[in-house]
């Protein structure tokens, strides 16, 4: 195996043609496509905290990924017990052919310390690996913290962005357009959150609220809330755990968040 390129981008030149990616055709599906029709991605590179798998000619941004990892684990106060497997695909079709799942651009398997992604570096799915070591609340908060952590430490950019837009700017714009889904009691449960058809809006809204909680109450309070929650918590359970962790009702925190967003 030969590596070319600088410290921020590694390219693997796989000697055997048999290790090249086989890409399947077809569009996205709402469910896994069934047994994979292509071989798993080949191992391509390794860094201090990751093992990378990608096709010949593809690349990952190792320096940026390691910088993000170093920042995030300190911020969350976690120790990751093993290297994370980073599986990078060239397209949704490629991902679907190899995993049977083609309805997303990225997903995590925290129990396997594995992420699957189309991106050359990742600051969202890796967060699911880290926070799973702490706890697993409803999807609203679980996705919210991942979005709130979408920063770029290597570039010195610590503003959380989702699909290129700063999350509080997005929340403000959605509110002005009357698009924010309110009150939050409608969507803080997993079923409520997943019931929003516009996932870009739902992720930005959750990310803005959780980023606000981190700013207002501190990361330790947020992590305390994570430790007590489960994915299937009902609304009243979430309300009680929220008040216990933050010393504030969900409704009061929502009002303060909206005042902050403007």
Where are these regions (language model features)?
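Bacterial N-terminal signal peptides that target proteins for export
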Residues: 2-17
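Acidic/His/Gly-enriched intrinsically disordered linker/tail segments
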Residues: 97-104, 110-113, 133-262
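N-terminal Sec signal peptide cleavage junction
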Residues: 25-29
């Amino acid at each position: 195996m030969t590596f070319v390129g600088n410290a921020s981008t590694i390219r693997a030149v796989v000697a055997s043609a048999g290790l090249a990616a086989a890409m399947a055709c077809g569009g996205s599906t709402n469910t896994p496509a069934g047994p994979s029709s292509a071989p798993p991605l080949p191992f391509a590179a390794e860094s201090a905290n990751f093992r990378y798998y990608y096709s010949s000619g593809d690349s990952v941004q190792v320096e940026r990924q390691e910088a993000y990892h170093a920042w995030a684990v300190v911020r969350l106060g976690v120790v990751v017990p093993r290297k994370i497997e980073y599986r990078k695909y060239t397209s949704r079709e490629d991902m679907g052919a190899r995993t049977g799942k083609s309805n997303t651009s990225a997903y995590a398997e925290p129990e396997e310390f594995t992420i699957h992604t189309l991106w050359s570096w990742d600051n969202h799915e890796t967060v699911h690996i880290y926070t799973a070591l702490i706890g697993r609340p409803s999807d609203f908060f679980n996705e919210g913290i991942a979005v709130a952590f979408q920063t770029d430490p290597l570039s010195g950019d610590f503003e959380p962005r989702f699909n290129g837009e700063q999350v509080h700017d997005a929340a403000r714009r959605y509110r002005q357009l009357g698009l924010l889904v309110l009150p939050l009691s409608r969507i803080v449960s997993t079923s409520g959150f997943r019931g929003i058809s516009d996932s870009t809006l739902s992720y930005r809204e959750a990310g803005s609220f959780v980023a606000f909680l981190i700013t207002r109450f501190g990361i330790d309070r947020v992590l305390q809330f994570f430790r007590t929650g489960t994915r299937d918590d009902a609304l009243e359970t979430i309300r009680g755990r929220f008040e216990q962790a933050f010393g504030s009702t969900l409704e009061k925190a929502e009002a303060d968040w909206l005042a902050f967003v403007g």
